[in-house]
Amino acid sequence: LKTSQYIHIMKLLNITVAIVLLTIISCNRQTEKNNPYKLKILSTSEEYLNSLNENNDNEFVDLIDWVPGVVLDIRYATSNNFTGQVVYDSPRAFARKPVARALSDIQQELKTKGLGLKVFDAYRPYSATLRFYEVMQGDTNFVAAPWRGSRHNRGCAVDVTLINPENGEELEMPTPFDDFTEKAAIDYMDLPEEAVKNRQLLIEIMTRYGFTTIPNEWWHFDYKNCQDFDLMDVTFEMLDEIRK
């Protein structure tokens, strides 16, 4: 090769190498931003589909399809939440298949009592957990520690209350959803008698079908064997595309 051609080829190679290196650095920085604690998180369609091949119970289903008559009030798809920001792109409620089955059974029993479920939140992408932690400036009393991830990120936790299906009104509870005060604790008793009774009814029926409580949020319930499910950072839109 002529010297000029050689120089030109070397310049092109150097440019190509530089582009590749910059791409790798950019990808690494994005990964660090999305998963700063280096957790095992499934965040692509391929990873999610592979998990379905391992166990069909890993499937995310839409609670609207699986729980007849359930009412959704997905606060994080609005600004009516503790962040004051819209966090979700759409007001959807997804959960793992066993969780949806249990909620369907609960809804059927509640129907015999003239009651029903309202869902405030279900599966939550890990990116939202990072955002909540940032908003709360590191306070993990009411938001999940991002170095562990939330059970919502695993698709096996739900935030719910009871309603009267006839008029859609919520039953009286100790506090509104996402009230970060001592009154939200499941053992707080300085409350109206009706609120205590309704809270106990909710806890009793949820625990009977495999859910457990957490101390400081009367509305939050984790399904049994929750740790068996992977942390997820798959968007609602991605789940919809996969389900088509």
Describe the role of every protein-language-model region.
Residues 28-120, 135-216, 225-244:
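Extracytoplasmic cell-surface/polysaccharide-interacting catalytic and binding patches
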Residues 125:
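Segments that shape or occlude catalytic/ligand-binding pockets
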Residues 132:
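Short active-site loop/helix that positions an aromatic residue
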Residues 221:
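Conserved metal-phosphate-binding beta-hairpin within the catalytic cores
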